[in-house]
């Protein structure tokens, strides 16, 4: 008869591994699962839903941080500030669509000069007339 006790030669109990580490994620799967359950989005929450949501959130965070890091490097800075996040999000078409209604605190505005306010390009026509005078 097979007993239910400890197996012969079994050492200490197996160390617990988090669902985040099982999925290879940095974002907390357990915490997201708790928020999904407490938020009453549905009566029941499947086992894969918090893992998938954590993966999506981690990907979005990595994408924004990479673009913000590039913006910081372009401005010769080593620290990402809200301005760099604003520039990163607004310069990316898909992130702008996703976060279009969001306001980033201390992000500033995108630099933009309307075309009618820019000076006319008269230099090109003068250069062509100067070439005619030389001949």
UniProtKB/Swiss-Prot annotation:
Its main location: nucleus. It comes from the Eukaryota. GO terms for biological process: heterochromatin formation. GO terms for cellular component: nucleosome; nucleus. The nucleosome is a histone octamer containing two molecules each of H2A, H2B, H3 and H4 assembled in one H3-H4 heterotetramer and two H2A-H2B heterodimers. The octamer wraps approximately 147 bp of DNA. Belongs to the histone H2A family. This is Probable histone H2A.7. It comes from Oryza sativa subsp. japonica.
């Amino acid at each position: 008869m097979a007993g239910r006790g400890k197996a012969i030669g079994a050492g200490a109990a197996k160390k617990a591994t988090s669902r985040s580490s099982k999925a290879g994620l940095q974002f907390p799967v357990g915490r997201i699962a708790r928020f999904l359950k407490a938020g009453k989005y549905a009566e029941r929450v499947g086992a894969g839903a918090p893992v998938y949501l954590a993966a999506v959130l981690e990907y979005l965070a990595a994408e924004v941080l990479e673009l913000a890091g590039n913006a910081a490097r372009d401005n010769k800075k080593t620290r990402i500030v809200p301005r760099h996040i604003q520039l990163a999000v607004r310069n990316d078409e898909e992130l702008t669509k996703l976060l279009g209604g969001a306001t980033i605190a201390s992000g500033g505005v995108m630099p933009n000069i309307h075309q009618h306010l820019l000076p006319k390009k008269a230099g090109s026509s003068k250069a062509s007339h100067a070439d005619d005078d030389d001949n």
